[in-house]
Amino acid sequence: MNTANFPWLTTIILLPIAASLLIPIIPDKDGKTIRWYALTVGLIDFALIVYAFYTSYDFANPDLQLVESYPWVPQLDLNWSVGADGLSMPLIILTGFITTLATLAAWPVTLKPRLFYFLLLAMYGGQIAVFAVQDMLLFFLVWELELIPVYLLLAIWGGKKRQYAATKFILYTAGGSLFILLASLTMAFYGDTVTFDMRSLALKDYALNFQLLLYAGFLIAYAIKLPIIPLHTWLPDAHGEATAPAHMLLAGILLKMGGYALIRMNAGILPDAHAYFAPVLVVLGVVNIIYAALTSFAQRNLKRKIAYSSISHMGFVIIGFASFTDLGLSGAVLQMVSHGLIGASLFFLVGATYDRTHTLMLDEMGGVGKRMPKIFAMFTACSMASLALPGMSGFVAELMVFVGFATSDAYSSTFKVIVVFLMAVGVILTPIYLLSMLREIFYGKENEELVSHQQLIDAEPREVFVIACLLVPIIGIGFYPKLLTQMYDATTVQLTARLRDSVPTLAQEKQEVARVSLSAPVIGN
């Protein structure tokens, strides 16, 4: 069966969105039918994702594949244009995987289940579209599509300060989106032709100062979503009020949109400007790692502690992105996928713990490990993954970024030594705050007031299944990284070569080598 010409990506994007529109008319009284319907749609869409890439995607091809383009507004060269390469393909698979598990994690939701699952499925299609669309205006539209579902998930199903957290989220992200729109319009109308096609935009000859201005605009927008300090303050508040399924989507997918867009837009379209901004990004990455780790250590609220841990781990993505090495960029992509899995697992377990203890304050916990041994074991395993224990995906990703940056010839030796040392400090801080978190929750003397007022039952099969599904790829990638890296290495190698050509010193060295090679005598003739 020839599937090469089938509109896979369009089907994968539109299926959950179309399915969400049917939810209001499905007969259901207590929400049980709706949740099974949403889970079935999620599983079908994820199966389509896996099948499409298994049958129609070539790992050795660095260019866009599964390409579809349908005219939308021909006068402005606006098209429904989608495609996938090594950067987007792992994140599309991650989106399908995490969203399907988040649907299962939402099983206890009883408040407005129709609206909840409608938003979940709408987000499903929108998030895949972010990683697949190849038209800048379309990218802006699907980027904005994510704001409304996340806002409502926070504002309706969040905690006591949900309105504050939701409003802060929408102000930050909508404000950042303005920079995407302005930069996209400016690029589209630059030069003799008007186009929003990303590949065409990358071929335009922008003046360097113009590139720097565009790069700064995109950086502000994507730094909010990643997030990069100091544009991070919305995330701890959002995580502090979100429910477990919303946590999984925030940590597992939403943050990756920022990292993906930085690589796709800033590096892919504006490589010359990237050469000037890269040292700044490295410094910002180090600040993310150290500052967020120290702040996480000081947090007494469990959700905020894990939220700052997420910010710290995303610092490795920034440094790998700015390393100008194949290994560093490969590590950055691997870290995005790894953190998506680990972050989703930790926040799911935080939600499971809160459902039983009804508190997020570490001072009010203690000694619950004896009463909840399964949750204790799963929390420990996922924490080990987060602190980059060898044999788990986090270790491989961070090691690749370490070695990739340390071997980069785009920076001075002194700068590299300082950065690697500070990265190592951040890695050392991670087990300190995570192990102390485990000790405060599960070890020590039981809080008698907590035990007497709450029924501390252990994990149910549904919860064990969700964590098992997340741990399998975490451990699988940890022992055999090629399982994932082979999917995108061809694309990252091609992009790194282009980025290295944009660095004046590296480009000059390349020209010198080429000149010497051409002028050297041929030995053996």
Curated annotation (Swiss-Prot):
Which GO BP terms apply? ATP synthesis coupled electron transport; electron transport coupled proton transport
Catalysed reaction(s)? Answer: a plastoquinone + NADH + (n+1) H(+)(in) = a plastoquinol + NAD(+) + n H(+)(out); a plastoquinone + NADPH + (n+1) H(+)(in) = a plastoquinol + NADP(+) + n H(+)(out)
Give any Gene Ontology cellular component: plasma membrane-derived thylakoid membrane
Alphabetically sorted, this entry's keywords are:
Membrane, NAD, NADP, Plastoquinone, Quinone, Thylakoid, Translocase, Transmembrane, Transmembrane helix
Q: Does the keyword Mitochondrion apply?
A: no
Q: Is Membrane among this UniProt entry's keywords?
A: yes
- Lipid bilayer topology: Multi-pass membrane protein
Judging by the UniProt lineage, the source's domain of life is Bacteria
The cross-references to PANTHER family, in alphabetical order and at most eight, read: NAD(P)H-QUINONE OXIDOREDUCTASE CHAIN 4, CHLOROPLASTIC (PTHR43507:SF21), NADH-UBIQUINONE OXIDOREDUCTASE CHAIN 4 (PTHR43507)
Give the family from UniProt: Belongs to the complex I subunit 4 family.
> What is this protein's function?
NDH-1 shuttles electrons from NAD(P)H, via FMN and iron-sulfur (Fe-S) centers, to quinones in the respiratory chain. The immediate electron acceptor for the enzyme in this species is believed to be plastoquinone. Couples the redox reaction to proton translocation (for every two electrons transferred, four hydrogen ions are translocated across the cytoplasmic membrane), and thus conserves the redox energy in a proton gradient.
Entry protein name: NAD(P)H-quinone oxidoreductase chain 4-2
Taxonomic path: Bacteria, Bacillati, Cyanobacteriota, Cyanophyceae, Nostocales
